[in-house]
Amino acid sequence: MEPFFDGGTGRLRAPWRLLLQYLTYKILVPLLANLLAVAWVLAFARESGLSGAPVVRSLPDSPLLPLIGGVAGLVGVVLSVWLAGRFLDRRPFVDFGLHLSGGWWLDLLFGMALGALLMTAVFLIQLGLGWITLTGSFESFLPGAPFWLAVLLPAAVFLCVGFYEELLSRGYQLRNAAEGLNLPGVNPRGAVVLAWVLSSAFFGYLHTSNPNATPLSTAFVALAGLMLGFGYVLTGELSIPIGIHVTWNFFQGAVFGFPVSGLRIGGATFLSLDQGGPDLWTGGGFGPEGGLLGAGAMAAGILFTALWVRLRRGEVTVHAPIAEGPKPAYRPSHPPEGRQ
């Protein structure tokens, strides 16, 4: 068997496509982040009248740093997936789960509602058990900015992260892994399920360097990957995963004031709190995603996603076309009648 190219299509095999896309993404994101940081430094220095050096020294503490990272991640993932789709996968960009029909947007709204409700349940359970103490509300962490303006910062960051992480982990990685695993003896649905599990495990691994990460938090983030990927596995679209991801993070960090995978995005928060209770259940410094309550919410998210898909489509089944290669472009073998 040819190790690099598929003899039938001439495309690179799935492992090489995955590797090249990921390397492109890892090169583009820091490059774009540095370019955005330089642009911000120059603009701020010009507006403030300060020299570049003091502004550069203040950059690591700037509340805009998460936004720079979010925008760089968004552009880097979109560009790397588009390039890989165009030149490696040979499939249109929309085939990575972005067929923006009316039903797509309805599924997105469902996902957003579900992510908000799941995190609200985690908060209310902890509040009822006395594991959190509220210390403030409607707090802005941007100097001189009112709350309504400051809260746009985490909203923008979580919109970027929710979109680009789903496009990367589910839209590109899960799809290509499923195609690569669609081998003799493994039916297409089985390949999709295997790819779902493997891509979720890799999603957990990607969070191992986050602050306060533990082996347990890594396992639970992998479970979050299963929850987020479930809607994609059932529909072949990213609408439900993106919706859940955006509001899960926003309500976790900007509404209830929890850490999000160990990170504090800043900007503003509707509520501020002191975290108590057992770390095993709450996730401690990693946030709810690292605790049993968060894991329970993820399991509930899988259940509610299945119920929604059953309601919308009449059945709950793995979307086998995820494991299929792109359809060949139609090229007529002879000119139409009446034309030379």
Predicted feature locations:
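Membrane-embedded alpha-helical segments of multi-pass membrane proteins
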Residues: 71-76, 148-155, 168, 219-223
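Membrane-interface helix/loop boundary segments of multi-pass membrane proteins
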Residues: 164-198, 230-237
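Mid-bilayer segments of alpha-helical transmembrane spans in multi-pass integral membrane proteins
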Residues: 112-128, 159, 163
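Membrane-interface helix caps and helix-loop-helix hairpins in membrane proteins
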Residues: 159-160, 206-215
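Small-polar-interrupted transmembrane alpha-helices in polytopic inner-membrane proteins
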Residues: 119, 189-208, 221-222
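Hydrophobic alpha-helical segments embedded in the membrane of multi-pass proteins
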Residues: 176, 218-231
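N-terminal, membrane-interfacial amphipathic/helix-forming hydrophobic leader that caps
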Residues: 1-93, 97-100, 104-105, 252-340
